[in-house]
Swiss-Prot record:
Database matches in CDD domains: GrpE
Descriptive protein name: Protein GrpE
Annotated gene: grpE
Region Disordered, annotated ranges: 1-49
Gene3D superfamilies hit by this protein: 3.90.20.20, Head domain of nucleotide exchange factor GrpE
Acidic residues bias (residue ranges): 1-17, 34-44
Assembly description: Homodimer.
Annotated PANTHER family: GRPE PROTEIN, GRPE PROTEIN HOMOLOG, MITOCHONDRIAL
GO biological process: protein folding
CC terms in the record's Gene Ontology section: cytoplasm
Keyword set, alphabetical order: Chaperone, Cytoplasm, Stress response
Origin superkingdom: Bacteria
Main location: cytoplasm
Amino acid sequence: MNEQPNEELQSEDEQFDPQETVSFEGETAANDEAFAEAGEETRDEEMTRLRGEVEEASKRVLQAQAEAENFRKRLRRDTEAQLKFAGMPLVTDILQVRDNLLRAIEAATTAGDGESAAGLVEGVSMVRKQLDDVLAKHAIKEIPAEGELFDPNFHEAISQMPHPEIASGMVAHVATPGFQMHDRVVRPAQVVVSTGDGSA
């Protein structure tokens, strides 16, 4: 009866195979290696995807820059065109005044000698009034000068003269009228400035 346990142990030892353990460990190592390779492929795919996203973002940035540059060029062209032709309304109105001036001259040349001078004066006076109205329409007005205190911001002194009735520093005579548009001087009035009566 004592021999049976030994036989059972021997039988169990015979059933244990170390090669099977080695084979199992080999399969585990192979699985780990395969998993690592799969992980490397996943990282490569991720890098490829990220590179694609970066390239796409770069394309969008370049496209946005190109659109912005085109907008700036178009805006610059439009601004230049507006500045270039900003005076068109004024020119149109002045051309109408020129037409009326030519009509006044033609009427004076076809009239008799006596009527010619009077008609010319009247016609030119009317044209001048029309021209002043056109200038006023475009916010262009004559700078007050004669009898005013000399102001270098609006007046240009071309000479001085004594005057018994006009105080020193006052404008005694206007040689060429000055004009301003809104609050900006287009050209200063050229004036003669009084030095007073000279008694001092």
